[in-house]
Amino acid sequence: LIYVIIAYGITYVMGLLMWYGYGKGLDLSAFPNAQMLYPAAGVMMAYLITKKGDKNLPTAFYIFFVALTAVLVVCTAASVLAPQNRDLMSMPYSQWAPIMEYVIIGGSVIFWILLLQSGKEKRRSYGLNSEHWNISIRMILLFIGLYLLRFVIACALSGQLSEFGKIMANPTTWIIFFTVLVNFFLSVVAFFGEEYGWRYYLQPLLQKKFGLKGGVILLGCVWAVWHLPIDFFYYTTPDMGLAALASQFVTCISLGIFMAYTYMKTQNIWVPIIIHFLNNNMVVVFSGTYSADVLQNQQIHWGDIPVALVMNLLIFGWVIFLKPFKEKKA
């Protein structure tokens, strides 16, 4: 219950602020960044309350993460309620945006320190450990290969294969790609925030109740619904919001199946965290724009969804037929 109140309650209350900010033409880029921390903050808050006496609870690490989430919620609300907006190339640009960035970077540095300080025993007890790197690296490389395959097919279908070739041949692409990889360490709190909530906490719960396959598909659905406010007011415009939400179901179910597979196979939460990071950042690199603006105000039409569904299920969803999903119920 505590988890649901934080992961969903805060998301939808902030969604009302997004709606207000959208109507005022304000910069809403703070919202998706803060929202990514809510699922993990929900898990941690629940554990801090219900498992107080456990000596293996990484208390300092948890308290810091919950506090960091609270700071980001305040900054995000302030970006709409006390906007310090400037026009940057005719786009609204909030002076809260760099503040949020500094909080996330500073928070990520402290995150690593406290994580390492909590010790192996506590990390292992609460799913924070990193193990089986041999298979883990293979899973991450498999994801990169499948992601690029999907990109190539999408370019071929839209007749832009030569454009993709130019992007791949451009040295800037690779410089930015490796810069982005370094950036993982400075933005880890956001991707950890989602995956610790979805894959570590919710996935085993749903699989216990609805079976190995059913639990993962249901998780994809609840993950998609969680994106609702940013689908309507950030990724697209409200008139395309429903199409964006449908598209989100396609992504969250197909990618969710793949990420569930990697987590079940490796028992290493850092694998889905890294995959989530790559999924969100490779589009910035390989779209050739080299800017996160590519994520905002996208054009998503109903006609695009059947193709996306087939392509994503074929590229990422096939793993549901592999061995980890066939064993006895978790």
Segment roles from a protein language model:
Residues 14-24, 75-90, 154-161, 229-236, ...:
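Juxtamembrane "helix-exit" motif on the non-cytosolic side of transmembrane helices
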Residues 48-55, 116-123, 317-330:
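Membrane-interface capping segments at transmembrane-helix boundaries
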Residues 1-7:
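N-terminal membrane topogenic signal
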Residues 238-245, 269, 275-330:
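C-terminal membrane module of polytopic membrane proteins
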Residues 145, 192-220, 234, 264-268:
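Membrane-interface helix/loop boundary segments of multi-pass membrane proteins
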Residues 8-16, 68-80, 144-152, 221-229, ...:
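Aromatic-anchored segments of alpha-helical transmembrane domains
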Residues 16-118, 137-141, 164-182, 302-311:
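Alpha-helical transmembrane segments in multi-pass membrane proteins
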